[in-house]
A protein has these predicted regions:
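Intein modules and their embedded homing endonuclease domains
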Residues: 1-249, 253
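DNA transaction DNA-binding modules
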Residues: 88, 98, 214, 224-250, ...
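Short alpha-helical scaffolding segments that buttress acidic/His motifs in well-ordered protein cores
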Residues: 37, 258-261
Length: 343
């Protein structure tokens, strides 16, 4: 006890003593009241305070027991039931260790309350426990979810070999999606076939509804004077243009795709680092970084070899027969062919 506390205690004792002495003085000529005061102070008051002390001790012990019981219940409930929340869309989700599903808040509340009722021990703290669990769930963001390996394999198998012809390509695509959700490397340009436009658009629409994130901002379908060092190439199978193929993936796996994508972006840091540090297919990596890494003169030479026809013609120049290579093409057409080549 500090000196200040000791002084305060002494003041309280003196104050109480003065009051008691005042009562004795007040009724010293009234034997009935005098005896009542004496009996109350000496006989009843100690019992009253002892009873108060015991009740308080019991209450504290009960609160400690309930607090411990509540903590154990909440921890057990959350460990056995993986609920997540997204504050942007105010959506709740449930993960059964295979698939993620959108979940109604009322259904979660019913699950919580029915679980408390079955245990019986927390009935007196039912409302308080419910509030604490819902608070913990709202703090459990979906972006921090770590999918099980069987979920990851399920997602990769849904994309490969249907849309991507290798698992590395599917993983790269997923990491790009995660980067876009977290707004990483937003200056990068990921060129993808126009055949994938509807697939990306629908995937993005559902992403906006579920988690409020745009997953398509770095995907481009045509070249428009983009900086070469920021360009990446994403190859997809031709069948991605078939609605009947990609619609099944969209309908059945979108939420799982988004969760695995966020996990990959966190795990590999970003899509470029996945290629450079974790992808074992050097040929694939070189294709992705082709525009970024190739020298511009070599790129132009390849463009000329692929798209430009050069005719050998004989012309007369100052009465001399000369063989020259003449290429005739308008600037507008040249730009069109260049974009077509890059696409």
């Amino acid at each position: 006890m500090t000196t200040v506390d000791k002084l305060k205690s002494l003041e309280n004792k003196l104050s109480a003593t003065n009051i008691i002495e005042g009562l004795y003085d007040k009724y010293e000529n009234d034997s009935y009241m005098y005896n009542k005061i004496h009996n109350y102070i000496c006989n009843q008051l100690p019992s009253i305070f002892e009873s108060m002390h015991q009740l308080r001790e019991q209450r504290v012990t009960r609160i400690e027991e309930l607090s411990c019981e509540q903590d154990n219940f909440i921890q057990s409930f959350l460990n056995n039931n993986q609920y997540f929340y997204n504050s942007t869309t105010d959506n709740y989700f449930y993960y059964d260790k295979l698939k993620y599903v959108l979940y109604n808040e009322d259904d979660i509340l019913h699950h919580v309350l029915s679980s408390i009722s079955r245990g019986r021990n927390l009935m007196s703290w039912k409302h308080k426990t419910k509030i604490n669990i819902m608070k913990r769930i709202r703090e459990n963001s979906l972006i921090n979810s770590i999918p099980e390996s069987n979920t990851i394999q399920m997602v990769i198998n849904s994309l490969c070999p249907t849309i991507f012809d290798s698992r590395n390509k599917a993983k790269y695509f997923l990491t790009i999606l995660g980067d876009n959700i977290f707004r990483k490397n937003t200056t990068n340009i990921h060129f993808i076939s126009p055949n994938a436009k509807d697939f990306i658009k629908n995937l993005n629409n559902i992403s906006q509804i579920l988690i409020g994130s745009n997953i398509s901002q770095t995907f481009k379908y045509k070249y428009h004077d983009h900086s070469y060092p920021e360009c990446r190439i994403v190859n997809v199978n031709e069948c991605i243009k078939n609605y009947n193929i990609w619609s099944i993936i969209i309908n059945d796996y979108t939420l799982d795709i988004l969760c695995v994508a966020m996990h990959y972006s966190n795990r590999y840091n970003n899509s470029d680092e996945f290629l450079l540090n974790d992808c074992n297919d050097s040929n694939f990596v070189n294709k992705v970084f082709y525009i970024k890494n190739v020298e511009q003169t070599l790129l132009v030479d390849e463009f000329i070899n692929v798209f430009i026809d050069i005719d050998n013609k004989t012309i007369v120049d100052n009465k001399t027969i000369v063989d020259k290579q003449i290429t005739q093409i308008t600037w507008k057409n040249m730009q069109y062919l260049w974009k077509l080549f890059l696409d």
